[in-house]
């Protein structure tokens, strides 16, 4: 047992050193001090949007530094007790050391994943849309299951989740939903989820208990700021207003506050019914439209790179990316990377999603 702990400690120390180099805690402490000084200056909240971003950055820096210091202290504690011959032989102490090892190894893996996120927009927040495929109620129920998985996963990363637009199924589930994941590296992680997710199970809506196949498509696009120029001509769009709807199409707002914008050159359609006023929903729609158009430009650039790349893997946008099999056996398998797990319940609880994303980033991170 002691020899096994020694080997694991070597790996932890190496991982901690790599984490320190990539995180640059000293640099982040200096950045934190500068931002905190700005936050106490008079007139800081005159520009609410800018102040909000700075406040979020301060909170994120504090969280990163706190997590790194906790990791560093735990590794030091493990090292101290392993060097103490008497303590390392104690069975209760070995149990405690195992818990500390598991925590540190998990945290090191998270930092390793962050090192793979080097894209120009990877640190941004993002929009994530889920749409039901053919299959009626069964597919709508699958969308709701996928939504639950992403909600739990986002919570584990301490990202804020906003529901931008939602259309419930006629019997059960959800036909379409758009979320905004607000937090650092939300896009870097979530971009791996774009594509079609396939479900195989015995349908609870089928009295004959037959096995059904359902599909849900996921689309992820980054939030972009005003520094990125996306040209949208007024004549290229149509703006429609309608009443916000709840489950079963029931109106939840007596005014036409919901907004839908259609962009003719690309065929992109975005909608928002989350905000209280039509003006706010229109602004949110325009932000989404800018992001969608920019994402389309990125995809076109990526497709050109794929043509020029002969010996590297290609990405097929909108293709099936993952299978979720509930019956006759349990298996989740990513068709792009080959990564798979048998614990489908943990997957649907959002607990194993990061492992799939890391496998994707290892294979595709350099070209996304």
UniProtKB/Swiss-Prot annotation:
Record's subcellular location: Cytoplasm
Post-translational modification: Methylated by PrmC. Methylation increases the termination efficiency of RF2.
UniProt-listed Pfam families: PCRF, RF-1
GO CC field: cytoplasm
Residues that bear N5-methylglutamine: 250
SMART domains xrefs: PCRF
GO MF annotation list: translation release factor activity, codon specific
Record key words, sorted: Cytoplasm, Methylation, Protein biosynthesis
Main location: cytoplasm
Gene3D superfamilies assigned to the protein according to its UniProt record, in alphabetical order: 3.30.160.20, 3.30.70.1660, Release factor
Family label: Belongs to the prokaryotic/mitochondrial release factor family.
Protein task: Peptide chain release factor 2 directs the termination of translation in response to the peptide chain termination codons UGA and UAA.
Entry-linked HAMAP family: Rel_fac_2
Name listed for the protein in its UniProt record: Peptide chain release factor 2
